[in-house]
């Protein structure tokens, strides 16, 4: 949004459509709405090989009449590259055991050029689907580019159905599940405790922070010079931290955003993301592996309580560094008018 104010920028955003649990997929698309609202001019997808997911991404833009161009990230996937990404657990990349078996067999049989055939086919399929272009990754050497160009020319006159048939043959796809991860579940409901917690905190937020009376009383209390006193300010901050940390994971950010995040604190995201998820989740799990992604929890809860528009529309500002370590209660009431 800041770049838009300066002008001269063509702003691109990343998007990962290769999500297979309902909540993490919903969270990705809800954030894409926000990115477009914030001023995205074009979209670049994560690297991936599931053409159905790319079709869904393009269909989403068409359905919502978004004019932004979308580009697909593509890569000639060799066994070495696939093994590297698996070894280093590159976040957000889906490479299935079936894909590894196909690549291993091709290497054994001396058919490694199939990686460039598939890349050429994927580029041409994306063109048929209405993608504006591709981001070609890991194809740097002139001989690699010439090989890719050779197969693009070879398949250029194929129709979409012919390309899809050849793609499926090269990946040995028979059930359409070969290029997607195995799911322990697709959809989950929020727990009763999550629903009760949301309802209680929502009631408290409305009563204590959004009602006209609360705003007036809060503004009157916190405009007093008392709170400029260091001991009083420290006591206030400590009181706020104790009351919120155990319930929502407060980290004294100074600019509480709970009302815009369904009372799931963005400070509990390892990356501190408030507007939605990164692209690195795997089946609802955070890329750090120690927790469920809070944005999946949030998307699941939003659907259950009819609040998906909040996650779709509300652009949450970054917390200024100078605000951190101050009382969000005081900052809230002084920034609002009764």
Each PLM stretch: what is its role?
Residues 1-22, 59-122, 140-142, 149-186:
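Active-site pocket-lining/capping segments in soluble small-molecule metabolic enzymes
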Residues 22-38:
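Active-site glycine-rich loop that binds ribose-phosphate moieties when present
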Residues 35, 39, 72, 134, ...:
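Conserved, mostly hydrophobic/aromatic
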Residues 41-50, 135-137:
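Catalytic beta/alpha-barrel core
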Residues 176-338:
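Ferredoxin-type iron-sulfur electron-transfer modules and their immediate structural context
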